């Protein structure tokens, strides 16, 4: 039967999700229970989660909604048969058709997941973009030395929310797929993230003027790893090495917390030089997430 999942299903959902991913890629970094709970609760808005239960959960679709972006993101995992997978996949999109008409849909899966990729294409979804998950391990302690005219300062997210919001929106304005939120929605979304690193927000300044930001997450804490949530530099300050300094600052911050590694996500089509920067600092791709889209 198809039913709505609850928090009571969290452990079984974790087993199903990791079973799906490890079947596709035996080297996949297993998801922690905290991530499943986050999926179930939703981010700024409540999630809707459907499962196919046939003597146990065989497939799940977590549906996240961002009304300000007019976007929904369904995440699909299955350890069932092809018929069971298709049944829940179709039920999930039927729910979207009924409840999220007019919304843009973004969904992702491992590039190695040929079965799910085929289901995406058979359902009329269009290829969008590939994204790397990259990890650096081990990581080193020690914050980088800064030029005399550059500073990197810790910033409380609430107190400095107006500035951090502006720095993110302006530095990511030209990035593919980025959709800026207004300040209040942006702050609410950040504060709703249970894995937000409340000591991991930093602002880079050049001659005292705000020039870039770094936001950190504890989303990999279960595997003793940190995560770079956002790293951006305003266009007028690019070419000064701020991105490298901020990245090294984030690495040192993660090491100070006792983490052994740090990860981040990057658009493989990013033309800003970010991918080369990450590779030069020792990050290596661990997963290629393939993105698909459609409009309901």
Give, region by region, the residue ranges found by the protein language model.
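A short beta-loop-alpha structural element at the N-terminal edge
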Residues: 1-15, 151-166
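Conserved donor-binding loop and adjoining core beta-sheet/short helix segment
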Residues: 7, 20-99, 106-109, 206, ...
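Conserved GNAT-fold acetyl-CoA-binding loop/helix
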Residues: 18-38, 172-189
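Acyl-donor-binding surface of acyltransferase catalytic domains
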Residues: 65, 79-150, 290-294
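Conserved acetyl-CoA-binding loop-helix of GNAT-fold acetyltransferases
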Residues: 82-96, 233, 239-252, 256, ...
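Conserved hydrophobic beta-strand within the GNAT/NAT acetyltransferase core sheet
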Residues: 105-108, 228, 262-266
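Conserved active-site alpha-helix within GNAT-family acetyltransferase domains
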Residues: 111-129, 240, 244, 269-287
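Phosphate-binding active sites in nucleotide-utilizing proteins
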Residues: 174-180, 184-188, 192-206, 210-219, ...
